[in-house]
């Protein structure tokens, strides 16, 4: 549903009725009308036969002019909803789909969902997710430095963070909707994908402390296998996951051994 077009129609009707306009010509009751729409969503006990429960999700598309979310419709919507997916034109230009900005988007249901993920997927799901989000946040800060002085000015540890964040973006967040396997990914597979990407960062950090060269770490052959893990069939996930983990450990051990020699 296009919330923006609905709000524009509401503004037009309000003007025709000569009602007192609010910010940017929208009626003063814009927020309450939006709340009535979104509050229809939720979990309900249906009428009729006993014991029937149902759920209704409402997803509204807000299209602010020029992408400026400070305008009234966006602000009124954000005050009501608890989940926000911010589409980013720059990601779309880079052919990164889904073009959802991971820094601007959020969900206020994370704390409520944590017990479910712990019970039905893995007990450390939220911790792994937080680790990846921390790397993406640090990448955004480091990008400002890279724009001014270049990648070569970064320390080896910061370069590793940049490479790990790139792996998160390209190997986990990026999705090919035209690929039969990558179109849908189960939660257990998503967990394994996150673990592999973060394992590269963890093992790489240990290798740096042991004296390994950052160029050797970022050019490891196992990174290609990590990137292609998302195209693994569900039936082959466990075997491929173990194989990639072993390959990563072997290459890291080789790098540190060569340094000692």
Which functions belong to the PLM regions below?
Residues 211-261:
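C-terminal amphipathic alpha-helical interaction region
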């Amino acid at each position: 549903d296009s919330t923006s077009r609905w709000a524009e129609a509401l503004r037009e009707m309000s003007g025709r009725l000569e009602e007192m306009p609010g910010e940017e010509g929208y009626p003063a009751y814009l927020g309450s009308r939006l709340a009535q729409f979104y509050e229809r969503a939720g979990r309900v006990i249906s009428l009729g036969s006993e014991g029937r429960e149902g759920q209704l999700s409402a997803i509204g598309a807000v299209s602010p002019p020029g992408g400026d979310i400070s305008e009234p419709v966006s602000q009124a919507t954000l005050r009501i909803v608890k989940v926000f997916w911010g589409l980013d034109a720059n990601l779309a230009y880079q052919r990164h789909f889904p073009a959802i900005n991971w820094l601007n988007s959020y969900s206020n249901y994370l704390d409520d969902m944590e017990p479910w993920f712990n019970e039905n997927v893995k007990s450390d799901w939220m911790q792994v997710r937080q680790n990846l989000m921390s790397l993406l946040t640090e990448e955004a800060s480091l990008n400002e430095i890279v724009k001014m002085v270049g990648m070569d000015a970064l320390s080896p540890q910061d370069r590793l963070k940049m490479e790990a964040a790139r792996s998160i973006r390209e190997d986990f967040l990026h999705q090919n909707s035209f690929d039969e396997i990558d179109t849908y990914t189960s939660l257990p597979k998503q967990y394994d994908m996150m673990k592999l990407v973060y394992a590269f960062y963890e093992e790489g950090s240990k290798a740096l402390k042991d004296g390994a060269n950052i160029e050797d770490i970022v050019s490891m052959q196992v990174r290609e296998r990590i990137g292609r893990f998302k195209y693994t069939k569900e039936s082959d996930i466990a075997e491929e996951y173990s194989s990639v983990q072993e390959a990563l450990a072997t290459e890291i051990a080789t790098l540190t051994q060569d340094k000692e020699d």
